[in-house]
Amino acid sequence: PLLRDQGNSAYVRDTGRLHGGMLEWGFYEDKNPRLVDPEDIGNPEKTMGSDSMRYLDLEEVAEPLEKAFETTPILNELGWDEKSSFNGLLSVTPDAGSLIGESPEVRGFWLCEAVWVKDGPGCARLCAESMVLGKTQVDMHAFDIARFYPEQKEKEFVKSRVYENSQTVYTPAVHPREPYISEREKFVSPFYKREKELGGHFDNEVARWERALAYESNRDKLEEYLADIPVRGNEWDRRHVPYELANAEHLAMSDSVGMINLSHFPIMDIEGPDAE
């Protein structure tokens, strides 16, 4: 059995051992998560038993543990077991997704990383399908290890985004289109200033590029096309994306003409047999 305390970013579970079991309490560090560089993961001075288990001081979890005593008083009765307490490493990516597939750098080297317990069976199946069949039953883009552009693998970018994702990895609930705060306005089009003047909606970036989803300057087109635009009644569905405005722009362009900024789209050179 597992008890989650989302407000405290913590959980309690019975490990189910023989002779009465054992309670285990865990906490996800959300306010100021500590990042570990890959080069430091196997540091013998900081690890215990496994490279993913690092030494833990009681002071590091004192505040959330105190709150846990209130919700589950038996923890206070059992006390602190220093020998079996540790800091566990979590694998977090710049977009909080898993990494599944064949390494782009090493042919034949397959990975299934940054996978949480609840996602384990599904991710394992996707990896197996990729290896055996060469394709999967579902779209793999959000998990594909090759989805990141070189600029998204720069160390400072990775650390900034991982730090941001780690703060919301357990609580609170995060909108699927929640905009990132760190590492913004790094890649902009030659028209970015003008797009801002036109009221461009730049809530989300794509592959580090700032891309407008719609423009406030086109709001007058809403009145003309409102009857043809689907209504999204729930605020959650409309959050971070100006759907009505974007739909009006598309309809207006279908009836007339328009200009689309494609400067941030990738240009790829295809080489090899039949590349023409």
List PLM regions with ranges:
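A broadly conserved detector of short glycine/acidic/proline-rich loop/turn motifs that flank catalytic sites
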Residues: 7, 16, 29-30, 104, ...
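Structured core elements
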Residues: 11, 24, 99, 110-111, ...
